[in-house]
């Protein structure tokens, strides 16, 4: 402390407030003299400075850089490749010793960690888990062009690990990882015949784009990945939207020189920082051993391959017997060195025999020509209980494809650095051991299965309807039943048929075929002297050949391609020639598929799976989900359906129509339906007002049914038509911004018949649909004017005052059509004030019936032509000329026609009135017989008669009832909406 005081005098020390203002960081930083600065120490002798090497170049208007020496220095070879803000590290390591094997144990691991885009993994442990599908696919993408360039007989274990260090989301890191792996192999001491260049080509609006960004790829109809050496093609991977073979060949020829731009920077970097290649022991076959095996087995092998009657397993068994006989000979001679490589030697002899016969004769092991397709059998709708299914066979290769539709929320979530966040179409390829008659284990993700499934998925993705038109999640399962080559292309064919069988509107069928290559190479120069392109290869031809070129597409173009080769590259001209051979074979396969099913199949039967999409508001969906999702899970458990909610849409997936109806019924019971203008809905009358009635729908929604919308006829009182608790069907005619719903009942009723065109010439006063008002004082004049047709008894009947009711519209029409002046209108006979209480419908009809009886007393047979038409003029009635004498006849015919109609109306109104009266008089304790109208999830809807509905709540006896059952019930209470609640009554009258 004393030293501090000596170094800082009292004059220079600030006061307490100044200390606080300066802060701890300022004090300890040495600004006040407490912490003297320490000069940078020079680099001591012997300290190794990190030395890095870098190569930069430009490809497709973007700067690419290779860098080594800064990180991962202990690896046999390590390179960081950068493009924009995306950087990928690739490392190579190799085992020092090899183990006895006859293949190259090359492992390629590609990894994307979330730190590369500044995120923490959204997992429970917040760590990256097992490799994802995309990581496996990128590993295969790196492996396929690299593997053929290792020397023959090099069986040391090699591991390549590619890791994404940072990603800006603009470029897909897979291409960068492949080029970085090539550069890392060039820097290592591992013998390898590289380098290679890998490029991506897109096509936007007909123009090819080199190294397109992810945004550009979304609008591109081509995604081509091309790998090559300086003059040979190594690998092709294509996903496109029906691109023609001509345009695809043009894209390949453009990609080759662009990919070559990656080669020279790798060579320059290897010259600066590369290691000397080591001498590794190669497991080579001696010429002496090969000659001896050929002498013992070549003739017998050729006889097996030239016999087309052999099947796959018969041929394999015959070849195994030949190998066993050769082994016995070597064991008798005691040649242990040859015994260790004998399987490889026998396989080499097989390859020479098959290849030489196909090159010279053009025939294959099963007797086909090089361009011939195996027999095809296909069957759609193989499993009717599924959404879609198809069985496809080509030769001995057979696959079973099934389609399952799901809700949009069931789409697969993709946790990758680039690309879409979800995938709604999935094809899962499965290769079980029994398909090759082998014993094996079923594990997790298999790289081969993932790769084959993704290839078939890309082939079918181009013909699927857009998500806006078909938003459902689609899953295809491709189960290989038997395998003899090209199972992935068979999955494309079977998957296309299964999609059609599921009713999905595909744009066209997609078929796939594998094309192989057999070459005759000059040993001295390594150039190809002769070759044969083989269509629809067998599994044996895939093993013994040089190329497996899988091509899928429609009649209009290619949708997916995958090229794998075994030699160190093939010329691009041969690749382009293979495209035309594949197109011809593809058209043959499409013919077979279209003969079986050529359009989407419609739903058939009540047992086929169902899928429905319903739109609801967010508030309604929250009600459906319930607290912690209880209500949603309850519906799924009780009905067996699956409910999915996504962005205001409810999707219901059910096994059959019955399950779908049960699920929709429970959904409607909880949240009701979103009423749409023009929609017809059933509801219950909850309350009656003077101006109308309120109708309640499932879910608690209510709408107003105004009295003007009850019927086409005028309604003076709503209760005369409706009762509380009555179940009615209405149409939604209007909804406003506040959510108020207006309903109509008359919109569903038939409109009244209009006047026929034949009545246009009749007098408008005497319409059939109208009634004439007759004054009491004029009755005698009417009788006096018709002495020839009216008897004294009839006169007495006509003297009775008649009260006839007609509508205001009919009165107005009669007054407008009448020739009298407005001042000369006759007065009504009854001038007294009407009663305050309106008369009932029955009393009105009785008064009308009395008038009919008075008018009917005029016998129609006594009517003569001398009876003139009665018109009102100057307040008096007088007869007119017989030329227009249709008044009496019209009056009589009208009365007879009206009589039957009014009698029917009288009986109907009496029934309605009695029904409504009985409903209003329904009291607690009233017993009656009811019929089960509907069976709901929580109870029964009972028909009590007279269009009156009641309810019965289940008491653990849900399964005892069905629609149409007759029950004896008693009214126990009324709910808040006025609906009677009933209880069951047994035969002894007890509840």
From Swiss-Prot:
EC numbers: 2.7.7.8
Which GO BP terms apply?
A: mitochondrial RNA catabolic process; mitochondrial RNA processing; mRNA catabolic process; mRNA processing; rRNA processing; tRNA processing
One of the record's GO molecular function terms: RNA binding
| Keyword entries, A-Z | Exonuclease, Hydrolase, Mitochondrion, mRNA processing, Nuclease, Nucleotidyltransferase, Repeat, RNA-binding, rRNA processing, Transferase, Transit peptide, tRNA processing
Interval spanned by the transit peptide? 1-39
The S1 motif domain, residue ranges:
678-746, 925-987
Report the leader peptide range. none
Is the keyword Nuclease in the record?
yes
Q: Where is the KH domain?
A: 609-667
Q: Does the keyword Transcription regulation apply?
A: no
Family matches, as InterPro entries: ExoRNase_PH_dom1, ExoRNase_PH_dom2, ExoRNase_PH_dom2_sf, KH_dom_type_1_sf, NA-bd_OB-fold, PNPase, PNPase/RNase_PH_dom_sf, PNPase_PH_RNA-bd_bac/org-type
Q: What class of enzyme is it?
A: transferase
Q: What reaction gets catalysed by this protein?
A: RNA(n+1) + phosphate = RNA(n) + a ribonucleoside 5'-diphosphate
The organism sits in which domain of life? Eukaryota
Where are stretches of biased composition, namely Basic and acidic residues? 822-838
User: What does the UniProt entry say about where the protein is found?
Assistant: Mitochondrion
Q: Where is this region: Disordered?
A: 813-865
- What does the entry list under GO cellular component? mitochondrion
Remarks, anything else? Plants silencing PNP2 stop growing after two to three weeks.
Q: Which family does it belong to?
A: Belongs to the polyribonucleotide nucleotidyltransferase family.
Annotated function: Involved in the 3'-end maturation of mitochondrial mRNAs, rRNAs and tRNAs. Functions as a poly(A) mRNA 3'-5' degrading phosphorylase and is required for the degradation of highly expressed transcripts of non-coding regions.
Name of the protein described by the UniProt record: Polyribonucleotide nucleotidyltransferase 2, mitochondrial
Tell me what gene encodes this.
Answer: PNP2
């Amino acid at each position: 402390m004393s030293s501090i005081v000596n170094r800082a005098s009292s004059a220079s020390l600030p006061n307490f407030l100044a200390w606080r203002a300066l802060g701890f960081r300022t004090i300890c930083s040495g600004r006040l003299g407490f912490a003297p600065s320490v000069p940078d120490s020079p680099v001591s002798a012997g300290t190794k400075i990190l030395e890095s090497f870098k190569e930069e170049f430009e490809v497709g208007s973007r700067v690419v850089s290779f860098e080594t020496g800064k990180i991962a220095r202990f690896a046999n070879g390590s390179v960081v490749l950068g493009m924009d803000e995306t950087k990928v590290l690739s490392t190579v390591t190799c085992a020092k010793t090899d183990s006895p094997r006859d293949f190259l144990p090359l492992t390629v691991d590609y990894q994307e960690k979330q730190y590369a885009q500044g995120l923490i993994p959204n997992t429970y442990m917040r760590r990256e888990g097992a490799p994802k599908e995309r990581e496996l696919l990128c590993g295969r993408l790196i492996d396929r062009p690299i593997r053929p360039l290792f020397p023959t007989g090099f069986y040391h274990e090699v591991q390549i690990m590619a890791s994404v260090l940072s990603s800006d989301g603009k470029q897909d890191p897979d291409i960068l990882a492949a080029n970085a792996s090539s550069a890392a192999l060039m820097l290592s001491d591992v013998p390898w015949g590289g380098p290679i260049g890998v490029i991506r080509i897109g096509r936007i609006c007909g123009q090819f784009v080199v190294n397109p960004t992810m945004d550009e790829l979304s609008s591109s109809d081509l995604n081509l990945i091309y790998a090559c050496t300086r003059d040979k093609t190594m690998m092709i991977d294509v996903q496109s939207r029906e691109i023609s073979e001509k345009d695809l060949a043009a894209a390949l020829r453009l990609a080759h020189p662009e990919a070559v731009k990656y080669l020279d920077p790798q060579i320059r970097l290897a010259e600066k920082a590369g290691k000397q290649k080591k001498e590794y022991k190669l497991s080579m076959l001696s010429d002496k051993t090969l000659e001896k095996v050929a002498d013992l087995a070549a003739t017998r092998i050729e006889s097996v391959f030239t016999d087309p009657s052999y099947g796959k397993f018969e041929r394999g068994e015959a070849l195994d017997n030949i190998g066993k006989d050769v082994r016995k000979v070597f064991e008798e001679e005691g040649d242990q060195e040859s015994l260790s490589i004998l399987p490889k030697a026998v396989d080499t002899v097989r390859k020479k025999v098959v290849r030489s016969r196909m090159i010279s004769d053009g025939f294959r092991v099963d007797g086909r020509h090089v361009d011939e397709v195996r027999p095809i059998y296909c069957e759609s709708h193989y499993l009717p209980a599924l959404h879609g299914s198809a069985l496809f066979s080509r030769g001995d290769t057979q696959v079973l494809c099934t389609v399952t539709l799901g809700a949009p929320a069931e789409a697969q979530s993709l946790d990758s650095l680039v690309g879409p966040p979800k995938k709604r179409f999935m094809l899962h390829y499965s290769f079980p051991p029994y398909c090759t008659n082998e014993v094996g284990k079923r594990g997790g993700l298999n790289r081969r299965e993932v790769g084959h499934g993704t290839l078939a998925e890309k082939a079918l993705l181009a013909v699927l309807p857009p998500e806006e038109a078909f938003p459902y999640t689609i899953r295809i399962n491709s189960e290989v039943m038997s395998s003899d080559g090209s199972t992935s292309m068979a999955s494309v064919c079977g998957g296309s048929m299964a999609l059609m069988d599921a009713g999905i509107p595909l744009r066209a069928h997609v078929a796939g075929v594998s094309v192989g290559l057999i070459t005759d190479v000059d040993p001295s120069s390594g150039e190809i002297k002769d070759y044969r392109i083989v269509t629809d290869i067998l599994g044996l031809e895939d093993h013994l050949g040089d190329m497996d070129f899988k091509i899928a597409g429609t009649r209009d173009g290619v949708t997916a391609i995958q090229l794998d080769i075994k030699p160190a590259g093939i010329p691009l001209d041969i690749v382009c020639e293979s495209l035309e051979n594949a197109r011809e074979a593809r058209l043959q396969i499409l013919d077979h598929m279209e003969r079986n099913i050529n359009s989407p199949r419609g739903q058939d039967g009540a047992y086929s799976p169902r899928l429905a999409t319903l739109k609801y508001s967010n508030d309604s969906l929250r009600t459906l989900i319930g607290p912690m999702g209880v209500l949603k899970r309850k519906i799924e458990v009780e009905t067996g359906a699956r409910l999915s909610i996504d962005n205001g849409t409810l999707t219901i997936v059910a096994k059959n129509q019955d399950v779908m109806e049960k699920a929709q019924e429970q959904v409607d019971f909880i949240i009701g339906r979103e009423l749409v203008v023009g929609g017809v809905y059933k509801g219950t009358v909850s309350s009656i007002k003077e101006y109308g009635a309120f109708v309640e729908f499932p879910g608690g929604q209510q709408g107003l049914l105004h009295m003007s919308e009850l019927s086409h006829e005028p309604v003076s009182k709503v209760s005369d038509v409706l009762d509380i608790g009555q179940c009615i069907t209405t149409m939604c005619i209007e909804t406003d911004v506040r959510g108020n719903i207006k309903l109509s009942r008359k919109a569903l009723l038939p409109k009244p018949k209009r006047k026929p065109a034949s009545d246009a010439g009749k007098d408008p006063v005497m319409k059939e649909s109208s009634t004439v008002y007759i004054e009491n004082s004029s009755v005698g004049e009417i009788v006096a004017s018709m002495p020839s047709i009216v008897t004294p008894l009839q006169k007495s009947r006509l003297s009775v005052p008649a009260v006839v009711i007609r509508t205001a519209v009919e009165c107005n029409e009669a007054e407008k059509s009448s020739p009298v002046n407005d001042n000369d209108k006759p007065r009504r006979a009854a001038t007294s004030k009407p009663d305050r209480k309106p008369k009932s419908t029955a009393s009105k009809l009785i008064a009308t019936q009395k008038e009919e009886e008075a008018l009917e007393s005029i016998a129609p047979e006594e009517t003569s032509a001398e009876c003139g038409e009665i018109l009102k003029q100057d307040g008096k009635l007088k007869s007119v000329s017989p030329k227009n004498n249709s008044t009496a006849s019209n009056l009589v015919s009208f009365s007879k026609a009206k009589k039957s109609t009014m009698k029917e109306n009288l009986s109907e109104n009496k029934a309605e009135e009695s029904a409504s009266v009985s409903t209003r008089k329904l009291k607690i304790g009233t017993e009656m017989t009811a019929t089960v109208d509907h069976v709901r999830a929580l109870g029964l809807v009972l028909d009590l008669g007279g269009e009156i509905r009641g309810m019965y709540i289940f008491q653990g006896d849900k399964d005892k009832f069905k629609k149409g059952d007759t029950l004896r019930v008693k009214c126990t209470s009324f709910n808040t909406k006025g609906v009677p609640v009933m209880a069951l009554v047994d035969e002894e009258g007890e509840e």
